[in-house]
Amino acid sequence: MEYIIFAAVMACIVILFMAKGIYDYKQSEKKFIRKRYSDYGVLPQREYKPEQFESISHYYQKHADGFCIDDITWNDLNMDEIFKKMNFTYSAAGEEYLYYVLRRPCMEDKELLHREEIIRFFQEHADERVAYQVMYHRLRRTGKFSIYDYLDYLDGLGRRSNMPHYLALILLAVSIGVLFTDVAFGILMLVCVLAFNNVSYFKVKGEIDPYIVSFAYVFRLLDAVKNLKSKVRKTESLKEEFEILRKSSASMGGFKRGSFILMSSGRMSGSGNPLDMLLDFIRMGFHLDLIKFNQMLSETRKHVSDIDSMITTLGKIEAMIAIGEYRASLEEYCIPEFADKRGLHAEELYHPLIDEPVKNTIATSSSVLITGSNASGKSTFLKTVAINSLFAQTIHTCLAKRYETPIFRMVSSMSLKDDVQGGDSYYMVEIKSIKRILDLTLSGEAPVLCFVDEVLRGTNTVERIAASTQILKSLR
């Protein structure tokens, strides 16, 4: 009787903890929803650890094709800080795709117009936007590693067999059977088998733990797709994206089947759950999660392209939501106009990192040489034009009253440093940087919009003027 009372009390305690956890989670989500309405357009205050920020670029590194913004130009424009101000995302898929968007300008306006459709829909429909943001908040981030790091590491696991785990189950079943014939020996055997199973469990679990995190994220991806299908309003703007998600998720049924063995709801949501303690004891003894892990590993390897499609598509939608919210944070912005004629026309441009900027206007159909006294804002103006040129072909948003330009490939050489480790002096770094610009102009694709600040400042005046003259002639 005492055992029954004890078990009942323990069950009540577990239920109370579960109820408290569910209540806290619901309250936290309600608070999140309220803030998404009230704080729309308020700049994010997130702090990034170096390893977390570094991993954000990994989707881009995997998908960098065609013309991309190179590291020199990215650093010249201080784009890391601009990205942080723009990062209104809540999932790894969203923030990694937003980074990708900023580093890969569109070379035709068709994709930009499609992005504009999605951005505008979420700007004009607050309830739908918040519903999506709640879904992305549940999807969450992956910590200091990108999901693509985990997917890459899968190959390092090699082929894995479930035979040792089946053997552990057989030994456990035999020891339980012996209990019915010889209690003393059966208990001894059961203790030994459980000890062996626990030791072998933790040895293998230590190897696979990082990948369980990735599987949990894939599961949340599938859950997000399911929520989009059933709970979130569908729009014509997202018709193409919904079709991609439908096809990608349809092939992943084997991955989800029985996944609760490996991943409890707490593991998948990242929120934790008291029931996990009980489940962990079962996993230790029976190795059920290790068996399921190997099955899910096999499924993941077969469907890497489908997982990539889901990450890309879900990330794209959230990135567009973030761009819309970034627009709401701006004092003034415009939608860029793209023309076939050569030239650049912009009214009242301003820099995104300056709180009280001085706005400037530029209208030119040829090369421009900017002169002026020290600290007059020449470099800042160059960067302002360059950033808005990049914004026009990425987020379809310019910090200006009006912005008109053709489609460009944009490149710069501004904030260079000597490369001590590489053995290059400041002068050689400048020469190599300028050469990459000249090489780009000779490729014969879209026209190049280049920004050079203080050409060849690392050499003497006579050589600097002579070399600069020839460089400028080549860039005309």
For each feature predicted by the language model, list its residue ranges.
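ATPase nucleotide-binding head domains, primarily ABC-like/P-loop NTPase cores
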Residues: 323-326, 330-476
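Alpha-helical bundle segments enriched in helix-capping/polar residues
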Residues: 1-366
